[in-house]
Each structure stands twice: as C-alpha cells, then as structure tokens.
Amino acid sequence: MSPTALVTGATGFVGAALTRQLLRSGWSVAIVTRPSSDFSAVEDFISQVDAYVYDGKTQSIIEILEKVRPDVVFHVASLVLTQHTPEQVESLISSNVLFGTQLLEAMVLAGVKKFINTSTTWQYFGEENKQSVNLYAATKKAYEEVIDYYNDAHDISVISLVLSDTYGIGDRRVKLINLLIDAVRRDEKISMSPGDQIVDVSHVYDVVRSFESAAQDLIEATSTVNLKFAISGARLSVKELVAEVERVSGKKINAEFGGRAYRIREVMAPPVLPLYISKWSKVDLGEGIKELLNSKVK
C-alpha cells in the first residue's frame, strides 16, 4: 500500500516540486491550501491530489488531519520576507508560527507521528550562528522551539531540512540565478553587490529528493527522532556564479559589481551544519544552468 503525504505550501515552487516528486514515486498526496491560494502553477497535478482548504482556524486543520491521517506531514509553507514592515508582523507570526503549531496540535489529535519541517540558513547568523538574519528567520527559529515541545511531549518524530538557495524551471521568485539568466537572455546590465559573498545553490530536484528520502527515514525509524540537516548543493561566490552562467551560456553578462551595496545583515557565507547525504547523483550546477537557459518557462 502506498504511503500518504500531507503537503503544506504545495502551490509554491518547492512545495509544488515536492508534490510532483511524491506523485511520481507513487505516494497518495493531500495538500493544504488557503482561500487565496493561486493554483496557476500546479494545474498539471491538481487533479491528482486531494486539496483541502485551511481557513486559519485550529479546528479547520484538525478536521483535515482527521480526514487524511497521513503517514508523513511535509511542512513547506511559509511567508518569506527578506525585510518586513510593521503591517507584515501579524502575517509573519500567523504563517510561520501559528499555522505550524495548529498543524502539530492536529497531528497529535489524529495520531500522526512523522513530520518533515523546512528551515532556512538565515536562522544561523553572527559569529556563533545564534542570531537570525531577519524577522522571517526569527519566526522560523521560534517555531522550532514549538516543534521541540511536540517532539518531547507527544513523541512526534521530526526531521528539519535547512534550505539555502534553490533554483529550477518554473521558479517565479526573484532569485539571483534567475536574474542572471534573464540578463543573458535580454543582454541587459545588472547592478550587483561586490559579489564576494558565498552562496549555496541547490537544484530543486535534489531538494525534493532529500525531502522524500528523509520521509522514508522517518517511516523506517524504530524510535522517536528529532534531527536537523542542511541540504547543500554548489558553494561558490556570487562572482563565481556569474562566471559559471557566462561559461555555460557562452555570453558575457554585463554585471556591475559594486553597483549596489551589500544588504543590511548580508550573509557572507552559509553556516556549516550537518549535511543530509544524498543517495543519488546530484544535479551539476552547470547542467542546471543549461536547463534554465534552454527552458521557455520564465
């Protein structure tokens, strides 16, 4: 019998890619959506999943868990803001702390014990990696305290996967690698930071394979676990990333290094964390860039 997954954030880039991967592998998949969810990027699989609407109330997610009773919950949903305004504080707390807490409470009531959480390297900032880059990262860190409680008090097994930069076809987010691809296509000047910061770039295929593999680890675990691993791809400086896009495309990028300052609280190098070891061959960065260049999806 195929396992059942409940996925939050399935209409986003990583969540949608994860849902597709689980379906390819034979999982039965249910997704949690909101009344405002945009399904335009998931039309290829929406008919293959059971979609449930979460209205913001605890009872709503309780009823969803009672109906689905998944083998594993994949919590990918989050509100990502590099900088926030006072008007966005409530949304950050609601999306990144409240919703996840409601989800864990519903898991307890439904007897669901396996949970894959999504973390961010922005939770590890400063000399000892104890600070958060921004309020978004601080809410993610606060939520992990909630996870620890449910793990300890209710024996929910957890693997948190820490993401850095992700990329792939269909990514509509404003990400550096997408900006570089656009610069190649349009032959436009791009204003950049000095470019000495180190980034860690992972193809979304490797990310979702890691999620699926971690879920299998939970299914096979014989005791309650609470583990955390980083997903790592290619580590290189921004200048080196520009050079790699130039190499693969065969075109010079009109990059103005130093055209803008580093961001406030710029991360100059990703934290060194225990890595999730892949059981497959990862997508080479050059091949991933070639895939983006050849894609008509922008």
Roles of regions detected by a PLM:
Residues E188, M192-K298:
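C-terminal substrate-binding subdomain of Rossmann-fold SDR/epimerase-dehydratase oxidoreductases
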Residues A5-S25:
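N-terminal Rossmann NAD(P)H-binding glycine-rich loop of SDR-like oxidoreductase domains
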Residues T8, V32, V73-A77, F115-T121, ...:
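SDR active-site strand-loop-helix element
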Residues L135, K141, E145-V199, V204-E212, ...:
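NAD(P)-dependent short-chain dehydrogenase/reductase
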Residues L79-Q83, S119-E128, S164-Y167:
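Active-site segment of SDR-like NAD(P)-dependent oxidoreductases
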Residues V53-S95, E127:
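NAD(P)H-binding glycine-rich loop region in Rossmannoid oxidoreductase-like domains
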Residues H75, L98-Y136:
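Conserved Rossmann-fold NAD(P)-dependent oxidoreductase catalytic core, especially the SDR/UDP-sugar
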Residues W27-S37:
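Conserved glycine-rich Rossmann-like NAD(P)H-binding loop of the short-chain dehydrogenase/reductase
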